[in-house]
Amino acid sequence: MKEIKKISLPIEKIEEPTPRNPAKKWIFSSIITIIFLIIMGFLAYHSLNTIILNYVDVETEKKIFGQVLDNKNSHRLAVENFATIKNHPTGQKLITDMDRVMVSDDDIENAYASLGGHITITKKLLQNAKTEEEILFILGHERAHIYNRDVISGLAKSIPITLVTEILGWNKNLLNPEQLILSKISREAEEKADIGGKKLLLDLGLNTACADRFFKNHASNFEKYTEFIASHPDTNLRLENLLKDNPNPEKSCTEFDYQDFLENISEK
């Protein structure tokens, strides 16, 4: 009877993953995938933003989105009736720039710019406003968002950021990278928009201190103001920037009474 010999076949032993020996290939491929997605998101972020800024100017944006997103149920704010504007030599240019200021019925103090060059201000904000300067600062702030391309550019930037965080599941974390990135972008845009609001007052030769009510009230009653402040810089810092380098501190404020202004709100 022949002796049976044991033959060792050259079969590679599969190394099972353990806590001390993780699946190295899986970890490596996951890291590569994450890096690839982040790079693609970064490229898409800059590409979309560059295309929009170079090929879609403000007037083109108004033509494309102005009528589509127009709210027929809202009312136009007759900016041309502001005493501080109609009596100013360059007021007509401001009236033209603000021909899309709409009044909404929302019961909260708020204002925002939207696609198509629209600016919306709530009836509640107008009811509580004390001076024309206050309203003009806010309108100038939102006008700056439009001309700085913050609305349409912000939309383009948010798409790749949202897609990458959704795919990677990072949007479910307590420290959501998407929210952190978009909040930083928003705060930077708000700082520049505040400069635009202040510049509007200075161009009209007005006292910037007359526009401080909104910030002062917000500082003492945070709960009342949500959307306009949510992703904005520190309120006290914004107030400080509004008041400093004021060339017209002695100029009296222009009183604003919403009840007297009702007749100046007309249907679009």
Task: Explain the meaning of each model-derived region.
Residues K2-K268:
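A Zn2+-metalloprotease active-site environment signal
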